[in-house]
Amino acid sequence: FGFGFIEVGTIPPKSQLGNPKPRIFRLEKDKGMINRLGFNNDGIEVVSKRISDNFPNGVLGINIGPNKNTTNKLEDFIFCLTKIHEQADYITINISSPNTEGLRDFHHKDSMKDLLDKLNKLKKLKKIKKPLFIKLSPDIKDSEISDIVELIFKYNIDGIIISNTSDSTRERLTDSKKKEKG
């Protein structure tokens, strides 16, 4: 036995420290965790080299997202896909993190349409054949689900990854750390 695949990321274009520590909280009473990592890593260029130098054979997924302080999240996704697609067996487009302000706005129909349209055009232009997965929030509103599904089919997204940290289920928790952001 072993791992069927490995996914690395979320990797943004530029290096960033992520959120201040502590970033992970164990909720012992609730048998759960809260995280607020904030995509802490060395950025797409350094991670790409690290993958080239160190990754053995096997299935590799690469999860991409925008920098926390970017002025254009959409362009960050385009930049990362352009830089990393040759090294990945599949690419995950992470729009699920509650720890990157405004990232979950891509769940709204017009924003998701813009994102998927640009990614699709880039795939055609660069002849990218790698599967694209989209990582969704567990806090999607019922009213958004049909629009999201419609766009996923329209743009031939290959897979869906659910989920990430939820912001909406805290009222059931009993641990004293339940109010930590993440």
Give the role of each language-model region.
Residues 1-5, 36-46, 71-85:
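Glycine-rich anion/phosphate-binding loops
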Residues 4-8, 35, 60-64, 91-94, ...:
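Hydrophobic faces of well-ordered beta-strands that scaffold small-molecule active sites
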Residues 9-59:
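A gly/proline- and charged-residue-enriched helix-loop-helix capping module
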Residues 10-21, 32-35, 89-109, 169-171:
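Glycine-rich, proline-tolerant flexible connector loops at the mouths of alpha/beta enzymes
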Residues 11, 65-69, 96-98, 135-139, ...:
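Active-site beta-loop-alpha junctions enriched in small/polar residues
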Residues 44, 48-52, 78-85, 109-120, ...:
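Generic structural signal for well-ordered alpha-helices
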Residues 66-78, 105, 111, 133-153:
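Active-site glycine- and acidic-residue-rich loops that bind
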Residues 98-111, 151-182:
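Glycine/Thr-rich beta-alpha phosphate-binding loop at enzyme active sites
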